[in-house]
């Protein structure tokens, strides 16, 4: 790393659709985890008089003021759609959460596979020109490799499902196979929206945002809800009643399904009117795009990653069952659900950025000044 300074701890930032995970290379877990759906501005002029009004609020502070702020979502389906707001999130990450001067630390960023090239260049430009970082690197296809490495494997297929997007990434002997990577715009936020829609059909009125719904979804860990005929329960067993208090004080009683754990929508997108393959079919289709000689290794190493695979009882059992039904009968199916998978991408990045062998991989400030933002395509994978 030409300009990075090897004695300085690199920063690792995993900017997801729903949450930002940030911290220092070499650490076991991120120091900061906060919502990335969170840049807020006053809805009405004058409503925050005397509250020390700012132009924008980020993270938990914006969320706490959601009743009087207009929340904005700078990342949609894993891709940055509002760069001004994304810049504010990065500023908040460095100065408020990690409390560091970014010009003193190399920065490792992650991005969704199949991210548009223009977005990669824009993020590179912001890091070097706005935050003056000494060096940086952007993980794309290699991002999913980290989840695989964290499980002790170098060959397998990673199903990464977060808040905004899901991906299947086949990896053989440490290398992602780009022709077989598939993207599915179905993830945690769709489950949240589905929950909100069904509760609205039941007659509940909300003053809270989808953020509150998201917390309820995670807390109750529903498989499916017995509130709408459009929501089928193919694997439902014991019904239980649970109460949940929304941030606005409203108490909702939900008939949740105990037994499975992973929301059925991920396997049956048609439940929310989406014409798409489920995560099991997407995983299968991704494997089928690979050479026939390596499919056995992929079927035997299906690794789950991301927050939307964390529901108790979880995608593990459902994925095993569904893939077994799709695959040849002679094929041995093994699904792996590492306990740390919610942060496996960040943890992998932390390990990678602290390796001595990685130091030559950084894009230095000098290289950026010489080649411009397009250098990210030559050096980052």
UniProtKB/Swiss-Prot annotation:
Keyword Membrane listed: no
Known catalytic reactions: ATP + H2O = ADP + phosphate + H(+)
Cellular location(s): Cytoplasm, Cytoskeleton
GO cellular component assignments: cytoplasm; cytoskeleton
PANTHER family xrefs: ACTIN (PTHR11937)
Function in brief: Actins are highly conserved proteins that are involved in various types of cell motility and are ubiquitously expressed in all eukaryotic cells.
Keyword flag Transmembrane: no
MF (Gene Ontology): ATP binding; hydrolase activity
Primary location class: cytoplasm
Record's protein name: Actin-2
InterPro entries per record: Actin, Actin/actin-like_CS, Actin_CS, ATPase_NBD
Keywords on record: ATP-binding, Cytoplasm, Cytoskeleton, Hydrolase, Nucleotide-binding
Enzyme class: hydrolase
Family label: Belongs to the actin family.
EC number: 3.6.4.-
SMART domains in the cross-refs: ACTIN
Organism of origin: Daucus carota (Wild carrot)
């Amino acid at each position: 790393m030409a300009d990075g300074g090897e004695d300085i701890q690199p920063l690792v930032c995993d900017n997801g659709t729903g949450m930002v995970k940030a911290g220092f290379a070499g650490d076991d877990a991120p120091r900061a985890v906060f919502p990335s759906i969170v840049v807020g501005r006053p809805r009405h002029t004058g409503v925050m008089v005397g509250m020390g009004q700012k132009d924008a609020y980020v993270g938990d502070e914006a969320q706490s003021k959601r009743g009087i702020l207009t929340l904005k979502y700078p990342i949609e389906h894993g891709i940055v759609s509002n760069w001004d707001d994304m810049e504010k999130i990065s500023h908040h990450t460095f100065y408020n959460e990690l409390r560091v001067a970014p010009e003193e630390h190399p920065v490792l960023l992650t991005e969704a596979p199949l991210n548009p090239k223009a977005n990669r260049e824009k993020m590179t430009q912001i890091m070097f020109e706005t935050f003056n970082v000494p060096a940086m690197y952007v993980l794309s296809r290699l991002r999913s490799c980290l989840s695989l490495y964290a499980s002790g494997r170098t060959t397998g297929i990673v199903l990464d499902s977060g808040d905004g997007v899901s991906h299947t990434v086949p990896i053989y002997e440490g290398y992602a196979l780009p022709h077989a990577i598939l993207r599915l715009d179905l993830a945690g936020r769709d489950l949240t929206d589905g929950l909100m829609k069904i509760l609205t059909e039941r007659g509940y009125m909300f003053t809270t945002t989808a953020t509150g719904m998201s917390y309820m979804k995670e807390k109750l860990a529903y498989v499916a809800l017995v509130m709408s005929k459009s929501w089928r329960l193919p694997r439902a067993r014991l019904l239980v009643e649970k109460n949940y208090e929304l941030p606005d004080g409203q108490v909702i009683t939900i008939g949740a399904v105990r037994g499975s754990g992973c929301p059925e929508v991920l396997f049956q997108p048609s439940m929310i009117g989406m014409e798409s393959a489920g995560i099991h079919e997407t995983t299968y289709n991704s494997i089928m795009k690979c050479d026939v000689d390596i499919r056995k290794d992929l079927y035997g190493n299906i690794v789950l990653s991301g927050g939307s695979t964390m529901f108790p009882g979880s995608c593990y059992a459902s994925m095993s069952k569904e893939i077994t039904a799709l695959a040849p009968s002679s094929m041995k199916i093994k699904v792996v659900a590492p306990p740390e998978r919610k942060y496996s991408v960040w943890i992998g990045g932390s390990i990678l950025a602290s390796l001595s062998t990685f130091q030559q991989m950084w894009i230095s400030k000098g290289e950026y000044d010489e080649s411009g933002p397009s250098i990210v395509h030559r050096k980052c994978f």
